[in-house]
Each structure stands twice: as structure tokens, then as C-alpha cells.
Amino acid sequence: MKILVFYIYLTFALLSPFIALFNQSADAREAENGSAAPDLAFGAYQRGDFKAALVEAKKRLQINPKDAAALALIGQLYIEGAGVNRDAKQAMDWFRRAADLGNAESAYIYGAALLQGLNVPKDRHRARDYLEKAAALNHGSALHLLGEMALENEGKPSDFSRALDYFKRADAAGNADASYALGVLYKTGKGLDKDLNTAAFYFKRAADLDLSAAMVEYAIMQFNGLGAPRDQQAAIALLRRAGMAGNAVAQNRLAHIYAEGLGIAPDLSQARYWRDKAREGGLADSALDFLSSVRGKDGLDKQELSAPTAPTQTKTQSIMPPTFQAPLKK
């Protein structure tokens, strides 16, 4: 049964792309490239002097044509249109060359692009090859995407065993989306025994990494004492954190909490505020039209636990590469 839906962010964001691509020390780059020269290319990029960054990166390639980090930097400049005319297709060629020389981030970017046919011909098999290159270097996002591919499995029954392996490796590498995916699998009992305690554990790991969808899931479990110790005040605080990050589901839950006085004193002003924020985020709720009470006072309705969580870009999701989110259908 096909249970995976891809929510794909295809825009290459400009927020901290240097950190996303080149989170290596100067010593590590020197060891990789066999060069002890000052890192003029990356220094220029960080200063915003993109034309100088391109010149210096090309100088590095003249010295060492196999300088994968310099190749990746040029790809970054072309994908941004920083110091050059934006040319996504040319950027992909630079990323491919860097990937072929062992640059993990470039292998992930190019593999993800191949998977979707983004500025390159769509090719699922080559995509897997490049993602596996990145995964072999413990790239968390590549491992997570391979896990999602195992669930989607080209329309065939999901390969849960393979997906779990990828997700757990990605989780160990600190990938929030993988932690969230594991939480969903344990919560729904897809491919393994249902275990709310373990689900809550993984949702909390993802929430601690600022993934707002996971904040919502963990907060609801915490509010109801399902899989996590009941703590309504902490749950409300976590929902506020997710709501302030722009998660419409969190905003909707907060509106109900304030309207009905669940765990706190009723506050219709706050209820209206969060209801309106959720509407702005695309989540309308007729039950809140007049802030009417639709749930009991003992906790959030069981329906809350199965409500879909709207994907919302967070710090971990707004970096340069295409990010694939996959809320699972029951």
C-alpha cells in the first residue's frame, strides 16, 4: 500500500547556504584538497563578495582540478545567481562534478534533483546512486530521503525494514525529519509494533531540533499524557513555540485551548489571535468561527492525535538543498 506523500520544497533558499554546504573546518578542507593555501574563496563568499569568491574558486581548480569543495562553491554561486547570472542547470553540473569527487552535500543535492527532474533529466536510479554516495558519508538528509524512497517504493508495498534502517541512521546523524518519520511510524504502527512511548521519544528528538511538526505531535501527546508524562503547561508552551514558528496546526490547537480553557484560564482574545494566525496559514476551522467549545475539559480530543500536521519550514528546513517532507497517511 502506498502510504507516502512527498511535500517537496523545490526552492533553493538563500538563508545560510554557506553553512549548509561547507560546514567544514579550514583544516578539513585542506586535508581533502591537499592544499594549505588561505581559504580565499570561502572567505570571499562569507563576506558577500561573490565575484571574488568565483575568481578564487576557479584559481583553486587551476591548482587542483579535483578540489570538490571549490566545485561545490561554484555550484552554489550559480544556483543563487550570486556574482553570476543564475543558471540552475549549470549549477547542477558543478554539483555533479563535486559529488563525483566525494562531496557529500553535492551528492545529496544532485541526487535529490535527479529524483524530481529538477534542472536535470529525471532519473530515479541515478538519483539513488548519488543519494547512496552521500549516505555512505553519513549525510543525514540523504539517509532520510532514501528512507522515504523505501516507503514510497515506486508504488509497490512499502519496504519498512529498509526505511527503518535509513531513518535510524539519519536520526543518529541528527536529522530532524528522520526522527519525525520514526515517530510517525511508531505512533501509527506502520511496519512495526505500535509504541507511543517510542513515538514520543522520537518526536521529542525532532522537536528539540526545531521541527515544528514534531513539536505539535509531542505537545499533544504530552498534553494528554499519552506516551509522555502529562504536563499541560509544558505542552502549551511547546505549541506556542511551534505556533510562533508558523505551524498552522499548532496555532489551531492553541485557539481551542484558549477558547475552552484547557489547562489554562480561558482567554478569548488569545483564542481569536491564534485562530486568525491559523487561517492565515491556510487552516480554517468552522468550530472556531464563534469560538464554540467542541471538546471536553479532560484533554484534547483523540482526533487531535491523528490530525495531519502541516509541513512548515523551520531552521532545519530552510537551508539550500531541496527538502523532502513526508507526513504518512494511515
Please place each PLM-identified region on the residue numbering.
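Canonical positions in the second alpha-helix
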Residues: 59-60, 97-98, 133-134, 169-170, ...
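Structural signature of tandem alpha-helical TPR/SEL1-like repeats
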Residues: 48-55, 85-94, 121-130, 157-166, ...
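Short helix-capping/linker turns of helical repeat alpha-solenoids
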Residues: 32, 63-66, 80-82, 101-103, ...
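Ankyrin-repeat and related helical/solenoid repeat scaffolds used for protein-protein interactions
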Residues: 216-281
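Terminal, low-structured helical/coil segments at or just beyond the last alpha-helical repeat
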Residues: 34, 265-330
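TPR-adjacent "capping" and linker segments in tetratricopeptide-repeat scaffold/adaptor proteins
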Residues: 27-36
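Hydrophobic face of amphipathic alpha-helices that form TPR/SEL1-like repeat modules
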Residues: 37-44, 56, 60, 71-80, ...
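Bacterial N-terminal signal peptides
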Residues: 7-20
